[in-house]
A protein has these predicted regions:
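N-terminal Rossmann-like NAD(P) cofactor-binding subdomain of oxidoreductases
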Residues: 1-201
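Oxyanion-binding "anion nests"
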Residues: 202-208
């Protein structure tokens, strides 16, 4: 049995990850953190898990060592505390954007600032198993690809392997949940339901 813990578990990504892991035969979820919900039952943030687990959220300071640590933090937070996280588990899977790009110069181009810890970026395997399975299996650190990049890559990879692509136009339609559970006028479902709006059409960082 693989003992896993989740950091940043009160958001949509953390909640869905927890749901998948709770029903995985090879994993046992030991801890899940949320500063906002610390001490409260997981179902207070994720009502769909009310009868699935008795876990309660804990703080980062309460985290104990585990086999695999899964990080679901906002952009920039993983790299800030990477030394702390790496001391807790020999294997880390990061669902944020902090280590997706293996080239610090490419990171600076897309994110508009230098990478805070450039010596680490090459240590992460790119986490799309359908195209990078062997590297992921051998890695101790994995950076999961973004949602738009995953959809685009999986759609185009078979064509690219056969050299059938001359040019590409990708038109992504994202629902209101893609913006996460932090409220804003742009992400408020009644405001955006049934509407189509362009969002950073030329320089969206999740293209990478």
């Amino acid at each position: 049995m693989i003992n896993v813990s989740i950091v940043g578990g009160s958001g949509y990504t953390g909640g869905e990850l927890l749901r998948l892991l709770l029903f995985h035969d090879a994993c046992e979820v030991k801890q899940i953190t949320s500063e906002r919900f610390a001490g409260r039952a997981v179902h207070k943030a994720h009502p769909n898990l009310r009868n699935a687990t008795a876990l309660k959220f804990c703080t980062l300071e309460d985290l104990e060592p585990c086999d695999v640590l899964l990080l679901c933090l906002p952009h920039g937070r993983t790299v800030e505390r990477f030394d702390t996280f790496s001391a807790l588990a020999p294997r880390i899977i990061d669902l944020s954007a902090d280590f997706r790009l293996a080239d610090p110069e490419v990171y600076a181009e897309w994110y508009g600032q230098p990478h805070p810890n450039p010596e680490l970026v090459g240590q992460f395997a790119y986490g799309i198993p359908e195209i990078n399975r062997a590297a992921i299996q051998a890695a101790t650190h994995v950076a999961c690809a973004g949602c738009n990049a995953t959809a685009t890559t999986l759609a185009l990879a078979p064509l690219a392997r056969r050299d059938l692509i001359s040019s590409v136009v990708v038109d992504v339609k994202a629902g209101s949940s893609e913006g996460g559970n932090a409220t804003s006028e742009a992400s408020h479902h009644p405001e955006r339901s049934g509407a189509v709006r362009s969002y950073q059409p030329t320089r969206h960082r999740h293209v990478a």
